[in-house]
Each structure stands twice: as structure tokens, then as C-alpha cells.
């Protein structure tokens, strides 16, 4: 765990929204008592335009016999009004969305007024198709403006959207439609990313051939590429012909704060999909307040969260929070490497982006290609960088800070989950010097605890399981149609707490470091080692670009350490390099971190959101090459054969 820290530049501090002293004072006030926490969230709720202001702030019990999570329960509002109408009144022609297409020649700027009209037209059309408050609508779309229009149109009329990432398979899509019993599907003819097409409409057709999808009465299809797709006469409707004749105003549905807002399915490693349910008032309050705090938001910011709308980050921090705040949000259809790795920098310059929020996977991928592509752009418009999705190793953090940000932009390393609705731990910029790889501090109203396996809360510098003491407005309310699974997963192991499933270290300064999933903590000879810590040590070696570490059976140590390593393109895999890597890790962490197996590979098995599927690597490390479980969420299933060959060859030596 590095203790190197980087102070915030004086220029940034001078303009920061919050000082270190203010953070400490406000944080302590926000957690002083349950009444103080309610008072804090009542104040944050004033950022929202309510139809009926809430008088009851929270009603929460983690007692399994009397369980409830309710926030602002007597309040009424409509989220689309908060994202659109109030800005149309004050600043109608401000860009709401800057859309950058897959090809660099394509871009579109959509004002709040134009977005409002598009949302109202689709909302009216959906009502005419019989979609009512509480009905589920599945979106299976590329990163085009109509995806955001569809999300907001659902909120306009009180429908519950379930966005399925456009890269998911027919089977995954079908399972989510069946579980949600959606009435309507909105899709496009095809998606296009990196000049490669995805047959979205054809996938929808195949998904709707599955048993249990009879709930779907219509499919709305956006014309994106223009390639011919089969259209079923009664069921399928072209988006543009549907909305063209509709009114530019749609009466917003009055929603109770605890009415469902959206479902978002997380892929468990096995079993049926897990539908995370978020509700209306608490979610938007938490999204907006954390957005303003973590990103030090200014009125003239051009903000780019690179997440696809199919993921929770794309919901909260690419769509709802920026639009609710009246901030211009950038939406990118393509991939960082098309047409070259310089694309991200060129987009930053083209649209004068001020805040960039992206994932360590993308940062490491760019870093692997070297600095030249990044230096093709100026990037002087940037003032703040963010990272999300997984722990960032200090080397990638360092490269992001110095090369992408030029050493002048604070990096906010954020920890949160689909389940939490918004960011929970992050260094609010201007309040604390940054430590590469640390998520640093809790946000207001959030009380993290470090708990050992016996359920004892640890004080001071400690390592253990991360739990949250108490509730917060953005918290998920249930797993759709499976409340028992919700209680069992998050509230049973450590009674009275929300169990995150993540491991954490708290250092001597009281700052937090996420060590990876609890099942990614290795117990080696009775010593606990976080895989993130070992991976960081490996990637600190100049020859390596990326690494994934898993446990493997070991005759002596019980659990051994197995590393899958991607080298930089200029390096060659040799036995001497393996030995050097092992020496390096032992030096960085200690002899206990001896690497028992090192596999030099070209690729790692990743989901479409960029997360490494470690259970596959665990099976391979144990010599199991078949029966690897559900591979439907893999971005590229062909990598499995390649990995199997590498492991077999090495184990045969």
C-alpha cells in the first residue's frame, strides 16, 4: 500500500467548492446522530423540485423481522421534470447532451429544450401504446441520444426502465425481459462501435422467441445504421414514424418518492439475473448531491462520463445526475481505440471537456499503448479526473494523473456499487491530498465500518470487510421479485449493517483502500493478501501492462498465488522475466507474496463492462479447463481457448 501522496494544486484549491475544514465539519454534522443525518438529507432534498415536499425523511430498519428502507416517503416528484423542465425554463438552449458518434465525423449537440421535446413526444407515444405507471420497459440500445430520451420518457410517464447493455447476448436479454415481464422493448436496427456492427434488432427478435416473453406487446426500433432488419407488422414500430406526430408536451406522472424508478440487472456468476431495484426520490437526491460534491461541479462544466448507459455509472453519472444539475453531459458511441488510441484526447479537445470520469480498465489499455497517442491532443480544458469500477493500481493512477491530466487535475478515485445508487467513498477534491489507489474518505452521511470475520468492528488502522452502518437515500430497496435473496445477500452475514462484499484497509490516517471483492482476498499460510495489492505490485514492474491474480490450490500453503500477466507490447515473455517479476513482488509486499504460477497471456477474460471474470481464472489456475460456468457475460468468449492453451502448456513443463 503506497503512502505517496499528491497535494491539490493551489490553482484548483482557490476555485474548489469545498475546503478541507468544511468537509470535516460538514461530515461530522451529517453523521452526528440519526436526527442529524435526516437533517442533512432534508437539506440535500432541497436540490430537487418536488411536487409535494417530503416531511418524513427516513424510515429505516435492518432488523430482518421488521425490515424496511424508505426515504422521503410522503414526497411526490417527477425525475424528468428535474432533468428537463426546470432547465428549459431557465436555460433552454444550453447543451444537455453532446453526442460523439462512432466515426469522428459524427457529432450532435442537443439542447435542454430539444431533449425535453424529444422526451415528451416519446412519452406521449408510449402512453398511446398502453404503457402505464409501473409497467416495465426494456431498453437494448447503442450509445445514441435516443437511449437517454427513452430513459427519461419512462420516468416522464412513470414506467420502470430496465436497460440491458447492447453487448449482452440474446439469452441474457431474454432472461431480463422474462424476469421483469416488460411490456415494451426499445432498441435500434444495429449498434456500431469501433466500426463493427451489433445486430440489436435481430437479437431482440431471437430473445422474444424465448418462452416467457409474452408480456411484450410492442418493439420500438430506432433507425441507426439503415441496414435492412425484419419488422413484424403488428408488434414492431419505427421510432421516428411513431414520435413525429406527437405533441411537444407530455404531462408528467406524479410519482411517490418510493415508487420504483428502474431495474438494473447485475450478473451473478451463476443463477438467474439479479434485478436491483431503485426508487425515485431517494435515488435522484443521492445522485445529484454526490455528483455536485465529488466532481466539484461548475456551471460551465462539460462533463464526460465514459460509461455505457447499460451500467449503473451510465445511469447515475452519465444521465440522471448531470441532467438534474443542468450540466452538459457527453455521450460517446465508440471505443477508445477507434480510429486510433488518440480518440479520447481528440474528443476532449473537440468539445473542451473539463471533467473526465472513466474506468481503470480503459486507463490501463491506453497506458499500454504508450504516451504518444495521448500527446497528440492538448487536453488543457481538463480540470478534474475521476475513476470508477474497480480499484486502480497506483501505476495507472500515476499515468492518468501525470500524462492524461498533466499533473494539474485532481483524480477522484470513487467506490460505489450498482446497489448503492451513487458514490459512497471518494476524495472530495480540494479537501485532501490524494493517495494513488485510495478512495480516501466517506461522503456525507455515509458511515463505513471495517469488520472482521467474526463481525467485530475494528478501530484505527485495520483490514477487513467493508460494511455500511445505516442507510442512505440512494440505496437499492430490493432484488426484484426476490426480497429473501436481497436480505440474505446484504443483511444476514453482518446483522445491522449493509454488507458490501468488498474488502477494505483503513490506514493510519483513517483513509480507505478497497482491496477487491472479499472472495478475491487470499488467505496464504494464514496471511490475508488482497489480490488488488498483488496486482498493483506486478503492474508496478515496467514490463507489465495489466495483471489479474487469483488463488490456486497449494500443497503447503493451502492457497497459492497465481498471476495472469499481460506484458507491454515491447516486451517478450521469458523465464528470466518471470523470475524477475516474482522477485519484484516479493520485494514490494514480502516473501509471503511469492507467485506460485505466472502465466504470460495476451488477453484477460473480461465482461462487457471491463471487469475481469476471476472465477474463470480460478478454475484455470486449479487445472479445470471445462465446466467454466456461465460465459454469456464475457465480452469475447474466444479468449477462453487461448488461456487454456497457455495454462496447459505451462503446467506441462
From Swiss-Prot:
The lineage of its organism: Bacteria, Pseudomonadati, Pseudomonadota, Gammaproteobacteria, Moraxellales. CoA binds at residues 193-196, 313, 525, 586. Acetylated. Deacetylation by the SIR2-homolog deacetylase activates the enzyme. Its EC number is 6.2.1.1. Mg(2+) binds at residues 539, 541. GO terms for cellular component: cytosol. It catalyses: acetate + ATP + CoA = acetyl-CoA + AMP + diphosphate. One of its GO terms (molecular function) is acetate-CoA ligase activity. The modification N6-acetyllysine is found at residue 611. PANTHER family: ACETYL-COENZYME A SYNTHETASE (PTHR24095), ACETYL-COENZYME A SYNTHETASE 1 (PTHR24095:SF14). CDD domains: ACS. This is Acetyl-coenzyme A synthetase. It comes from the Bacteria. Catalyzes the conversion of acetate into acetyl-CoA (AcCoA), an essential intermediate at the junction of anabolic and catabolic pathways. AcsA undergoes a two-step reaction. In the first half reaction, AcsA combines acetate with ATP to form acetyl-adenylate (AcAMP) intermediate. In the second half reaction, it can then transfer the acetyl group from AcAMP to the sulfhydryl group of CoA, forming the product AcCoA. InterPro entries: Ac_CoA_lig, ACAS_N, AMP-bd_C, AMP-bd_C_sf, AMP-binding_CS, AMP-dep_synth/lig_dom, ANL_N_sf. Belongs to the ATP-dependent AMP-binding enzyme family. Disulfide bonds: none annotated. It is an enzyme of class 6 (ligase). GO terms for biological process: acetyl-CoA biosynthetic process from acetate. Keywords: Acetylation, ATP-binding, Ligase, Magnesium, Metal-binding, Nucleotide-binding. Its cofactor is Mg(2+). ATP binds at residues 389-391, 413-418, 502, 517, 528.
Amino acid at each position: 500500500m503506497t503512502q505517496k501522496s499528491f497535494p491539490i494544486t493551489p490553482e484548483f484549491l482557490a476555485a474548489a467548492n469545498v475546503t478541507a475544514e468544511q468537509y470535516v465539519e460538514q461530515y461530522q454534522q451529517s453523521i452526528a446522530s440519526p436526527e442529524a443525518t435526516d437533517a442533512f438529507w432534508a437539506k440535500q432534498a432541497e436540490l430537487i423540485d418536488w411536487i409535494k415536499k417530503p416531511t418524513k425523511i427516513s424510515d429505516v430498519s435492518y432488523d430482518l423481522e421488521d425490515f424496511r428502507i424508505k426515504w422521503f416517503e410522503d414526497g411526490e416528484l417527477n425525475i424528468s421534470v428535474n432533468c428537463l423542465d426546470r432547465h428549459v425554463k431557465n436555460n433552454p438552449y444550453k447543451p444537455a447532451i453532446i453526442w460523439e458518434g462512432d466515426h469522428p465525423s459524427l457529432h450532435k449537440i442537443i439542447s435542454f429544450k430539444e431533449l425535453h421535446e424529444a422526451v415528451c413526444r416519446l412519452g406521449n407515444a408510449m402512453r398511446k401504446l398502453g404503457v402505464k405507471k409501473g409497467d416495465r420497459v426494456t431498453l437494448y440500445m447503442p450509445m445514441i441520444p435516443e437511449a437517454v430520451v427513452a430513459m427519461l420518457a419512462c420516468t416522464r410517464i412513470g414506467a420502470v426502465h430496465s436497460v440491458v447493455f447492447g453487448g449482452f447476448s440474446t439469452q441474457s436479454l431474454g432472461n431480463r425481459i422474462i424476469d421483469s415481464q416488460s411490456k415494451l422493448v426499445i432498441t435500434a436496427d444495429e449498434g456500431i462501435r469501433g466500426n463493427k456492427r451489433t445486430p440489436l434488432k435481430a437479437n431482440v427478435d431471437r430473445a422474444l422467441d424465448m418462452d416467457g416473453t409474452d408480456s411484450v406487446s410492442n418493439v420500438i426500433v430506432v433507425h441507426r445504421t439503415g441496414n435492412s432488419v425484419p419488422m413484424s407488422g403488428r408488434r414492431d414500430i419505427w421510432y421516428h414514424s411513431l414520435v413525429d406526430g406527437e405533441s411537444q408536451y407530455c404531462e408528467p406522472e406524479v410519482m411517490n418518492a418510493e415508487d420504483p424508478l428502474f431495474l438494473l440487472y447485475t450478473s451473478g456468476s451463476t443463477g438467474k439475473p439479479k434485478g436491483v431495484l431503485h426508487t425515485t426520490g431517494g435515488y435522484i437526491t443521492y445522485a445529484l448531491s454526490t455528483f455536485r460534491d465529488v466532481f466539484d461541479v461548475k456551471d460551465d462544466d462539460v462533463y464526460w462520463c465514459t460509461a455505457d448507459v447499460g451500467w449503473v455509472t451510465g445511469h447515475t453519472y452519465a444521465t440522471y445526475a448531470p441532467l438534474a444539475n443542468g450540466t452538459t453531459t457527453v455521450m460517446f458511441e465508440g471505443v477508445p481505440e477507434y480510429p486510433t488510441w488518440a480518440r479520447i484526447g481528440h474528443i476532449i479537445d473537440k468539445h473542451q471537456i473539463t471533467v473526465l470520469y472513466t474506468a481503470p480498465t480503459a486507463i490501463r489499455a491506453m497506458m499500454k499503448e504508450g504516451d504518444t497517442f495521448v500527446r497528440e491532443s492538448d487536453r488543457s480544458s481538463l480540470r478534474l479526473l475521476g475513476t470508477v469500477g474497480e480499484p486502480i493500481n497506483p501505476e495507472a493512477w500515476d499515468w492518468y494523473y501525470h500524462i492524461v491530466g498533466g499533473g494539474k487535475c485532481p483524480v477522484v478515485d470513487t467506490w460505489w456499487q450498482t446497489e448503492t445508487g451513487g458514490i459512497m467513498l471518494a476524495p472530495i477534491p480540494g479537501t485532501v491530498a490524494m493517495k494513488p489507489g485510495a478512495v480516501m474518505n466517506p461522503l456525507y452521511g455515509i458511515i463505513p465500518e471495517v469488520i472482521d470475520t467474526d463481525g467485530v468492528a475494528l478501530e484505527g488502522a485495520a483490514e477487513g470487510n467493508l460494511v455500511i452502518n445505516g442507510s442512505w437515500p440512494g440505496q437499492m430497496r430490493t432484488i426484484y421479485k426476490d426480497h429473501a435473496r436481497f436480505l440474505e445477500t446484504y443483511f444476514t452475514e453482518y446483522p445491522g449493517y449493509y454488507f458490501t462484499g468488498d474488502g477494505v484497509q483503513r490506514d493510519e490516517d483513517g483513509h480507505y483502500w478497497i482491496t477487491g471483492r472479499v472472495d478475491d482476498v487470499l488467505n496464504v499460510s494464514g496471511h490475508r493478501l488482497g489480490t488488488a495489492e498483488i496486482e498493483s505490485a506486478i503492474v508496478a514492474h515496467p514490463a507489465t501492462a495489466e495483471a489479474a491474480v487469483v488463488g490456486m490450490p497449494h500443497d503447503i500453503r493451502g492457497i497459492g498465488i497465481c498471476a495472469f500477466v499481460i506484458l507491454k507490447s515491447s516486451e517478450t515473455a521469458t523465464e528470466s522475466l518471470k523470475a524477475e517479476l516474482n522477485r519484484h513482488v516479493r520485494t514490494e509486499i514480502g516473501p509471503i507474496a511469492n507467485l506460485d504460477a505466472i502465466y504470460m497471456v495476451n488477453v484477460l477474460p473480461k465482461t462487457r463492462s471491463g471487469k475481469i471474470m476471476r472465477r474463470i481464472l480460478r478454475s484455470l489456475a486449479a487445472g479445470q479447463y471445462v465446466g467454466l460456468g456461465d460465459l454469456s457475460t464475457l465480452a469475447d468468449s474466444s479468449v477462453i481457448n487461448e488461456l487454456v492453451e497457455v495454462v496447459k502448456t505451462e503446467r506441462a513443463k
